[in-house]
């Protein structure tokens, strides 16, 4: 340890340097920590609140793919992530001895227009080329959807999956700890630069810094790069005490219905570009449930 004098008195600062420091303990930051620790890097994760306290600690958890036609690099990247997710979460949950709620349950989507029906038939063929063992089928009906809501049948894909976001964060964090990752919760970073982060608590040093602090991190990134980096979008969802087991998730009219493995079902979500309070629930959620 060494003592460093500043305007507020003496601060105690470690001389330890990490290979990687990650700002933010949401799903992206935790995933980076897990990947780095698996490669034997020393990792420190800091968060201004608790693990999974932001959008990553939500309840929706729909993991759904792009359509299998008009294939390009972005779709291939997402496909590789989704197709490998099952093995990934099995390993994470085994290491943590917790459940992320992951399950490849598939997805059904009602077809209400003939044009969409014809597109779906074409995508069925494209999936054979681009999706490997996973399918994009057109089916006549499903027990969860009334025939009047699906006049042209339904799309059924077997690539989609569910996860319980807040539980996934806890499972991933526990797995990271098993691998030696260090965590500092309730530790707000007010400044970062190459090789260093700092706050009222002191400073830490790392060869690489990853900023994964959600929409709140954009302000710091805007200042660091001197260009607008992004903004946050708020989503509201409802958790219902309805047990649908391992039924496929439903996507219709911009709304997801996701059955979870704990016997609950989530409906979501809103998409709000203009908002003032991130955790407030309002009439928009009621409107979504009514739909």
Residue ranges and their predicted role:
Residues 155-195, 199-208, 212-216:
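Helical element adjacent to the flavin cofactor pocket in flavoenzyme catalytic cores
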Residues 13-28, 44:
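Beta1/beta-strand and adjacent pyrophosphate-binding region of the FAD-binding site
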Residues 76-83, 113-116, 155-174, 279-283:
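Short beta-strand to alpha-helix junction loop
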Residues 69-70, 98-109, 135-179, 270-274:
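Helix-loop-beta segment of a Rossmann-like dinucleotide-binding subdomain
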Residues 1-20, 38:
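Extreme N-terminal leader/targeting segments of oxidoreductases
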Residues 61-144:
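Dinucleotide-binding Rossmann-like beta1-alpha1 core, especially the glycine-rich loop
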Residues 28-39, 48, 57-62, 67, ...:
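Active-site substrate-recognition segment that forms the wall
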């Amino acid at each position: 340890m060494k003592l460093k004098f500043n305007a507020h008195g003496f601060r105690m600062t470690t001389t330890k340097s990490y290979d990687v420091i990650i700002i933010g303990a949401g799903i992206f930051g935790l995933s980076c920590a897990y990947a780095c620790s698996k490669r034997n890097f020393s990792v420190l994760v800091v968060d201004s609140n608790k693990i999974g306290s932001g959008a990553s600690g939500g309840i929706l958890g729909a993991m759904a793919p792009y359509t299998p036609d008009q294939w390009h690099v972005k779709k291939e990247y997402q496909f590789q992530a989704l197709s490998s997710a099952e093995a990934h979460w099995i390993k994470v949950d085994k290491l943590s001895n917790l459940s992320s709620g992951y399950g490849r349950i598939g997805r059904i989507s009602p077809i209400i227009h003939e044009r969409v029906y014809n597109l779906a038939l074409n995508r069925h063929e494209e999936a054979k080329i681009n999706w490997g063992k996973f399918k994009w089928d057109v089916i006549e009906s499903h027990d969860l959807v009334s025939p009047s809501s699906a006049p042209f049948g339904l799309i059924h894909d077997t690539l989609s999956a569910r996860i319980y976001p807040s539980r996934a964060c806890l499972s991933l964090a526990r797995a990271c700890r098993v691998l030696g990752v260090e965590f500092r919760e309730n530790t707000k970073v007010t400044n970062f630069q190459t090789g260093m982060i700092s706050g009222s608590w002191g400073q830490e040093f790392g060869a690489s810094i990853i900023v994964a602090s959600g929409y709140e991190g954009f302000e710091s990134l805007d200042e660091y790069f001197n260009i607008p980096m992004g903004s946050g979008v708020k989503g509201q969802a409802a958790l219902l005490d309805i047990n649908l087991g391992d039924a496929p998730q439903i996507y219709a009219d911009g709304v997801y219905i996701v059955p979870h493995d704990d016997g609950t079902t989530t409906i979501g979500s809103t998409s709000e570009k203009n908002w003032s309070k991130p955790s407030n629930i309002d009439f928009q959620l009621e409107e979504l449930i009514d739909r």
